[in-house]
């Protein structure tokens, strides 16, 4: 049984997806620093929405904070794709075993980051949660 088969995903395509995911993740880390330095962390008082909307008026701190959330969502989807495609290739070729396991670890870390980000907003920036969110982002990248 194949998990996903949209196009024939050979090793080169999986490699390109991986590199794109790394680039987007690095951009997310940079944007996370911008969120902190511009004090935009609580520009959206609720989570996962922003003022009750998934697409609020994007200006000022809201643009920065909600943009960070949207980019994080993209990283999540890309990581899910990596898990699916490495699993699909792992079933055909055991050389993908470590890639599959690493992509699973990455997915767990992305989910943890999403939860920590949500807790950070809901509980108004508790130091331990914010610090853990930062530390996990460093470990992830």
Identify the residue ranges that each predicted region occupies.
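Structural signal for the C-terminal ends of transmembrane alpha-helices
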Residues: 83-91
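Interfacial helix-loop-helix junctions of multi-pass membrane proteins
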Residues: 35-45, 111-134
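Membrane-interfacial loop-to-transmembrane alpha-helix junctions, especially the N-terminal start
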Residues: 16-18, 95-106
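Residues within alpha-helical transmembrane segments of multi-pass membrane proteins, especially transporters
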Residues: 27-30, 34, 74, 78, ...
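Membrane-interface loop-to-helix entry segments
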Residues: 62-80, 127-140
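N-terminal signal-anchor transmembrane alpha helix
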Residues: 16-39
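Extracytosolic (periplasmic/ER-lumenal) interhelical loops and adjacent juxtamembrane/interface segments
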Residues: 36-66
């Amino acid at each position: 049984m194949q998990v996903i088969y949209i196009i024939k995903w050979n090793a080169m395509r999986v490699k390109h997806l991986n590199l794109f995911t790394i680039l987007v993740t690095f951009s997310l880390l940079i944007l996370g620093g911008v969120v902190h330095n511009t004090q935009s962390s609580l520009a959206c008082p609720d989570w996962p929405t922003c003022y009750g909307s998934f697409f609020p008026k994007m200006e000022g701190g809201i643009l920065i904070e909600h943009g960070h959330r949207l980019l994080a969502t993209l990283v999540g989807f890309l990581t899910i794709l990596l898990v699916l495609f490495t699993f699909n290739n792992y079933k055909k070729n055991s050389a993908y075993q470590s890639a599959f396991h690493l992509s699973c670890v990455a997915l767990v870390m992305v989910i943890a980051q999403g939860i920590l980000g949500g807790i950070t907003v809901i509980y108004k920036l508790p130091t331990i949660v914010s610090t853990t969110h930062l530390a996990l982002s460093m470990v992830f990248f």
